[in-house]
Amino acid sequence: MMNKLYIGNLSPAVTADDLRQLFGDRKLPLAGQVLLKSGYAFVDYPDQNWAIRAIETLSGKVELHGKIMEVDYSVSKKLRSRRIQIRNIPPHLQWEVLDGLLAEYGTVENVEQVNTDTETAVVNVTYMTREEAKLAIEKLSGHQFEDYSFKISYIPDEEVSSPSPPHRAREQGHGPGSSSQARQIDFPLRILVPTQFVGAIIGKEGLTIKNITKQTQSRVDIHRKENSGAAEKPVTIHATPEGTSEACRMILEIMQKEADETKLAEEVPLKILAHNGFVGRLIGKEGRNLKKIEHETGTKITISSLQDLSIYNPERTITVRGTIEACANAEIEIMKKLREAFENDMLAVNQQANLIPGLNLSALGIFSTGLSVLPPPAGPRGVPPSPPYHPFATHSGYFSSLYPHHHFGPFPHHHSYPEQETVSLFIPTQAVGAIIGKKGAHIKQLARFAGASIKIAPAEGPDVSERMVIITGPPEAQFKAQGRIFGKLKEENFFNPKEEVKLEAHIRVPSSTAGRVIGKGGKTVNELQNLTSAEVIVPRDQTPDENEEVIVRIIGHFFASQTAQRKIREIVQQVKQQEQRYPQGVAPQRSK
């Protein structure tokens, strides 16, 4: 697809040859024709990088016949839809910060980094609606970050310019959550590097890491802010499998050189982080896969203990010892196995027919795993690359049991509107500020991200230890909002590092169904507690409210609480269906 540029604020004296010469002088040669109008012109570039270079080099900077010319993408009003391009992003800006900024103005479907030779970064962003894209352009144009000012343009929305029937888009992989195998699946390599080597990997003014990313066509995120004071820092590498392996090899060489020069360490092992759900398949039956990799590459491979895992740290550390060449070869084989496991799991997830409408498991982003949510510059034009791997996304069995009566699909608007639910979540009083954020920024962003209403109820007294957060929204919104709140409390150290975040949640159920939740002799509630690991309390002597509802208390970690909430809602739904089937109180006959 050609990148058509608009050249504005031209003097009437300007000719097509003037423009050709000016572009040529700036080493921006025009291959196609110049379409000259009165006061403006259009030119085409087949490559997006050249188009970006022309905009950055000329717009507002070059005078032609006494007038400063303007250069931008030419996007007709009918094509000004959901896609925008943001340029002049600081090279050192953490991707997580940019993600949060974009989410303030709407639901981001896709963010694609554009590989350019400019010092600053460029991303193409697709919002869910054209209104959100318009708002983002209005609010972010000229947004100052340190000494950098964002430059934003509309770019053509391929789905608008060449519309196709919904079923074709689904088959071809357009839209979030699609499982098309035609596109490159992004499964990043995560490694741990000693903190003392981080500076060497980045290099003076970021030159070393820029060289790595340029040579390997990769994006390398060094999560320096994670685990302050820790001996090791996670690094995430997004690229093709070949690019990932080459970037990993270069990082190993830099670390070994630094270790030799500083004599800080004799050996620098390669430490790969992998989600626990994949490790069994990497090891293989009786350890055969791992032994084969060790034998073929001449390395020694060990894997961290299961005891180091928690719900907030689902990754195991795979330590590879050997020469740089041997470790690099082992990385290739290890990642082959991990990618295969990931792709199989994602295929299973996408085939699930038992999930929430429109639930994009990979994009939930409910816990801070150190992964950027920006996809890599992979995937054909117009097809968003697969979302980054989220550790909890592969638990297809967990999700299918959690949401047994909902259907997954990339087009949520094709389904009936999901039922609204209200949950009261109790958080430590001292955490209220962190949840609200500066001038309410965090809670607003969270509400937009989750698609829920989130309010913090007034304190019942001056010395209360907990405050109630009222969340209203459909099941997926509840999952996202509650998950982010659990994660935020962990991130902000309101709980000890080795302590799981356990919160109390209240849901209201019709008083007529409370007995069914308890079960005969407490059998149902006991089974529920055993199944979910949550504490479930249904007070027997509770007086129903004006809506004839009573409160069920649920106490536990995030997954435990979510499972209990879903199962209780399921019981309530079953009772409702029975009441609709037998409205006159005629109970179904039971066979003895």
From Swiss-Prot:
> Does the record's keyword annotation contain ATP-binding?
no
Q: Which residues carry this modification: Phosphothreonine?
A: T543
Q: Which domain of life is it from?
A: Eukaryota
Q: Please describe the organ and tissue distribution of this protein's expression.
A: Expressed in oocytes, granulosa cells of small and growing follicles and Leydig cells of the testis (at protein level). Expressed in testis and ovary.
Q: Which SUPFAM superfamilies match?
A: Eukaryotic type KH-domain (KH-domain type I), RNA-binding domain, RBD
User: Secretion signal: which residues?
Assistant: none
Q: Which InterPro entries match?
A: IGF2BP2_RRM1 (IPR034843), KH_dom (IPR004087), KH_dom_type_1 (IPR004088), KH_dom_type_1_sf (IPR036612), Nucleotide-bd_a/b_plait_sf (IPR012677), RBD_domain_sf (IPR035979), RRM_dom (IPR000504)
One GO term in the molecular function aspect is:
mRNA 3'-UTR binding
Where along the sequence do coiled-coil regions lie? Answer: none
Record's keyword terms, sorted: Cytoplasm, mRNA transport, Nucleus, Phosphoprotein, Repeat, RNA-binding, Translation regulation, Transport
- Residues with the modification Phosphoserine, per the entry, are S11, S162, S164
Where does this polypeptide localize? Nucleus; Cytoplasm; Cytoplasm, P-body; Cytoplasm, Stress granule
Report domain RRM positions: 3-76, 82-157
| Keyword RNA-binding among UniProt keywords | yes
| GO CC aspect terms | cytoplasm; cytoplasmic stress granule; cytoskeleton; cytosol; nucleus; P-body
**Where are the annotated segments for Disordered?**
157-182
Q: Name one GO biological process term.
A: energy homeostasis
Q: What is its main location?
A: nucleus
Q: Where is the KH domain?
A: 186-251, 267-334, 420-485, 502-568
UniProt comment concerning the protein's domains:
Domains KH3 and KH4 are the major RNA-binding modules, although KH1 and KH2 may also contribute. The contribution to RNA-binding of individual KH domains may be target-specific. KH1 and KH2, and possibly KH3 and KH4, promote the formation of higher ordered protein-RNA complexes, which may be essential for IGF2BP1 cytoplasmic retention. KH domains are required for RNA-dependent homo- and heterooligomerization and for localization to stress granules.
UniProt function note: RNA-binding factor that recruits target transcripts to cytoplasmic protein-RNA complexes (mRNPs). This transcript 'caging' into mRNPs allows mRNA transport and transient storage. It also modulates the rate and location at which target transcripts encounter the translational apparatus and shields them from endonuclease attacks or microRNA-mediated degradation. Preferentially binds to N6-methyladenosine (m6A)-containing mRNAs and increases their stability. Binds to the 5'-UTR of the insulin-like growth factor 2 (IGF2) mRNAs. Binding is isoform-specific.
Give the PANTHER family listed for this entry: KH DOMAIN CONTAINING RNA BINDING PROTEIN (PTHR10288)
- Subunit-structure text: Can form homooligomers and heterooligomers with IGF2BP1 and IGF2BP3 in an RNA-dependent manner. Interacts with HNRPD. Interacts with IGF2BP1. Interacts with ELAVL1, DHX9, HNRNPU, MATR3 and PABPC1.
What's the family?
Answer: Belongs to the RRM IMP/VICKZ family.
User: What protein name does the entry list?
Assistant: Insulin-like growth factor 2 mRNA-binding protein 2
